[in-house]
Amino acid sequence: MKIPHIPVLLKEVIDSFKGVGDGYFVDCTLGYGGHSKEMLKQYPNIQHIGIDRDDEALEFSKDRLSQYSHRSRLYKGTFANILPTLEESPIVGVLADFGVSSLQLDKKERGFAFDSDTLDMRMDASAKLSAYNVVNEYSKERLEYILDNYGEVRAYKRVASAIVEARASSPISSAKELTQIALSVLPQGGKIHPATLMFQAIRIEVNSELQEIEGLLDALENRHYKDEVVSLISFHSLEDRLVKNRFKKWTKKCICDSHAIRCTCSRDNDIGKALSSKPIVASKEELKINPRSRSAKLRSFRFNANR
């Protein structure tokens, strides 16, 4: 079986779950099963649940994890929707890798790559909204909003204007064409491709990625898991900021108003602790093998046993 994707921070992810008890491990972003297979191998007492919205990834992982079929079950859907509905107990570990898989990036027909002849970017091929819809149907103001807020594109107004101007004559039908628009208005020669942040913004909009992460964090907070480890891998500042801020909230003992003269709460409102003070990043050795791991940041959190 040819493996189409190298899991990032594999050793670091596996190590983050050391000491978890018997129970269910949930891989919220199953992808091509790299992290899940190693977890099943290293932790023989866990049961596995895999979630993904990509049919191709689910089929591949079903085959790849077949030797563990008696310990594994797979669900299609978004993790923000499925995790809150799981009845399996106890859940002792949750993993989410928010990155786009190498196969999704490399398969031209998926429309994620700069030189794709299609304009799609859907992680779930059955979803209604695609990059084509965003680029050709959104107002200039809405395009400005997503380019600014989801891509942090400095010249977001200029890029939005260029898109609207280009589609006025004929629809923008390929990622390749969209890339050329970016190249025509954005400076070149930087560390990343000029179209990178524009593509990021559109992909986030198409797949509701930030809303999904918020939904996952809400589910983790509201389900009152006990002695559970959560490991989350982000790939850009917007994702990492959401995770970092939520972990900070979860470790806060005092919830009194910042202007209060004295503390009137019980000062025991923390629900766990972060397992490292800073995010874990790829080693030099991993970067040589898998350059796409350069942006990956792993943050882990352990909920209190008496929560």
Q: Predicted regions span which residues?
A:
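S-adenosyl-L-methionine-dependent methyltransferase catalytic core, i.e., the SAM/SAH-binding region
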Residues: 1-307
